[in-house]
């Protein structure tokens, strides 16, 4: 049977022949529905499609519970983005969206490393063209940066794959027995692990906001899925690294004031939560990690939608220029509140359930208090956003464009879905077929859910002057770019020795002969 | 069956007839050239399709005794070059039909001389003939480089001539030394007689062979003629050079090394290691130098040097998997480079220059050609599902299987470096229309069909090979047998 991601890729191919926007939308919608149906109906834990490449057997369709759950949320979210971006997505980006989302979904259902690598790179290439803009120089360079860093990760993954293949002789997607370092390096870039995270804020803060909504949901989550499938350590190292990520992401985010940069850094922090979940060995925490991934896509999407709508209606994205918007954009404000409370893990909001699950699975006090601290930080960040964007009266930006109905509808739909899941844990458990033995609404877990938010609310007036907004540039050089530039300087030297002088060239070839002869004479 | 010798005779006959036709009636030149390359291609495909029944095949000129006669051999290893020839020659002749506008007779004459030389080098089993065909190839190459009569092409041709001649001296020296040591020039007799020589003598012989042919397949630092030569020549020559001629020279060197000296000698006396390290150096150097280039052709020239590095690495592993991977990449790189050069030629029609900054905005004018460009560049980096991934996978697998971890890592690193400069091409082509807003360049009206076909066909092949690399690996599956085991080669003519 068909891999659930393939309908989208076929739709992308079909779309090339139709220039009409409506038809392309129709194809995309149809493909997403088909893939949802496939995911819900196909039998699990069975090889459903295979192919061969050279002398290797590829497993093209193998559905496990976690991949099914992530896949469902991937296609649901794509539907929501299509609604939100109905008036914004360009004709070309619809095609690329199909390939991007299609390969993100397809990668979840393959069972071997070759096809895994194939879709891994396809995601990168599709994202490159999504980011790329012929007319804008900045976007051209960001796209270049994006693809270079991701291909670096991809090649590292490839090296790991081939080391493992050479060692074990098979390419089945299981925790590798050799070359684990290269797998981890490749995945770390994809998930934007602390230190490799620079592409996240760069990309998501600069591209058109409707694309940021889309892209932010997939790339790093695919990385988390890969980590879950591939990396299996004896220790809880990943969980502690995840904690580091959760706290580091907050430190990075809190001092920024560009809306989408803040949200991007907070992705890093939220990824940390997921890593804590899947890095632990017990079932509850792992389920919680995957569940958090699902929730995260929803509320992070909503946050990006909120930021996008603010930008669309006021033309500003930096908190220094915003303020007093709550009356002018009530729907956006509502979405902002729901998203903030969800990301903060406030009880009866979307993020609460998965955070409670992760906390229930923790086995050390350090992790528990670390995550609570991260919760305080997260709450603080988004209280800051809400305050400076909607409530504070310093600025009073005008509404230059009323956001179209589709954007508001998209935000309302996603908020409604989030609230539905938050109020109906039994339903969500049925949809995702998870059965944790955790009482979500016991007194202690509600208390530990409320705590961080309350602390943050109390701290905010005290810390306000330290984290108040300031103007900033979106694109800054980082370590990787400096490395690149130093390499280019080396290149210039190499280029310069090619002077075009014939005598020099002749002497090079004679020198080569001489060295060869010397090697033979001396070694012999 | 006289088919193999026809591969030499047909272009040779074309050369002489071209002279006559150029004198009497010019309108027959094109049909003649097309017919002759079509015939050659048919012969090549005959061998490719009947490889199981007809090969290995030896042809004895003049029916002398096998050990005295000049022999021509077509075995499974020869198929590697045949595959490239079958795909590239006809397509490049087709492409040249509109590219060459003046002095057609001269151009096709030189081109056919080149075909004579390459076909001869690939098939001959006689060292002296090898040298003759080597010189035929070289001299026609020098002339073709100078063909455009521009300052830059004349200067490049002069440099190429100088470097080529110096290297040819070493090749000749090596052949003479071999003859003095063994008393024969028959390639099947040399192996056992060379075995008695002291190790050092054999090593020095190898050094001479390496330098002599190394200039031609552009191993760093003997590569210096290549980027210069590529700038001022017709696209047809660019394609033929990087897809066929360079490969042929390397092919011959490998045959000499593995057949004459044997795998054990090469591995026990550092030759394999030297080649391996040299290949890595060549690859990294080529990638690094390509970064700074503004001229598209020069950049692709450096990229060819780097890609040859991969081939050298693969071949120097000395395992069947390595030879197979190297052969695969040789053919595959020919396909990719062919496609990209044809596409570059098409872009040049509209842009009027090969400078990257002058090519800005071409994507708006030629969307399909630009798409081909992007596809092939991604393939060169090794991004699936294009054929570049298959060859990179094969090389990596082979080198790890042979226990070489570092070379494999370097290949990964090299691929990463190559992404940097390939991206700069893409970004230049896909920059918004700024140069062409007021004066649209000439030639936008449309490409002729013969300019579209070659690039399209090769791109299609590249995509198909990406999904089904087994098509090509099946074709060359037995190539390693005839390279790594001397006896297989020797038995084609004597014994067996």
Q: Which ranges hold each PLM region?
A:
Chain A
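Transmembrane helix-loop-helix hairpins at membrane boundaries of multipass inner-membrane proteins
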Residues: 1-6, 10-95, 170-172, 434, ...
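Membrane-helix interface motif
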Residues: 41-50, 163-169, 343-358, 420-437
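Hydrophobic transmembrane alpha-helices and their helix-loop junctions in integral membrane proteins
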Residues: 80-116, 125-398, 403
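Hydrophobic membrane-spanning alpha-helices of multi-pass integral membrane proteins
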Residues: 336-341, 406-423, 483-489, 511-512
